């Protein structure tokens, strides 16, 4: 007992606050350990260019996740979710069971099957912000903050945000500090926390 009291007092002696500093959670960004060989990631892990795909650094563990991509330069691109088994060198994604993506033509693909499509008059253009919600069942697309009512589903397992580019496309990712307020109940990606 005396040892435990001494331990507690030791934290407070010499004007100490008794607080133990907590580690700051890392920021979610594009993961250079999980990207295609011809992909270039810049702007502190927030911009993708080159050719190929890249996963984000954190999986979608919470029930309702939201993230955004801003189209800086048009070309061939796709955004959505994927497992770590996806081939990030083989684009377009959405051709197998390991990815569910919306492509630049507005089609949502999973397992080489078109699951849904944006209205023809609502295709994302340069400067637009595309938001993605995912609730472990359904992926939904938002264009400049507006729900496109274009759900798609089918992917299983632990998924990560994914983006791919080709043909001079440049996209910026936002995993926090969003351009548009997430829909009710959805929030930024949270790192899974472990307490030892």
Swiss-Prot record:
B30.2/SPRY domain residues: 2-184
Query: What keywords are assigned to this protein?
Result: Acetylation
Q: Does the keyword Oxidoreductase apply?
A: no
- Annotated transmembrane regions: none
Task: Supply the Pfam families for this chain.
Answer: SPRY
Which cysteines are cross-linked by disulfides? none
InterPro entries documented for this protein: B30.2/SPRY, B30.2/SPRY_sf, ConA-like_dom_sf, SPRY_dom, SPRYD7
Q: Which residues carry this modification: N-acetylalanine?
A: 2
Per the record's keyword annotation, is Acetylation included, yes or no?
A: yes
**PANTHER family on file:** C13ORF1 PROTEIN-RELATED (PTHR20951), SPRY DOMAIN-CONTAINING PROTEIN 7 (PTHR20951:SF2)
Output this protein's name. Answer: SPRY domain-containing protein 7
Natural source organism: Bos taurus (Bovine)
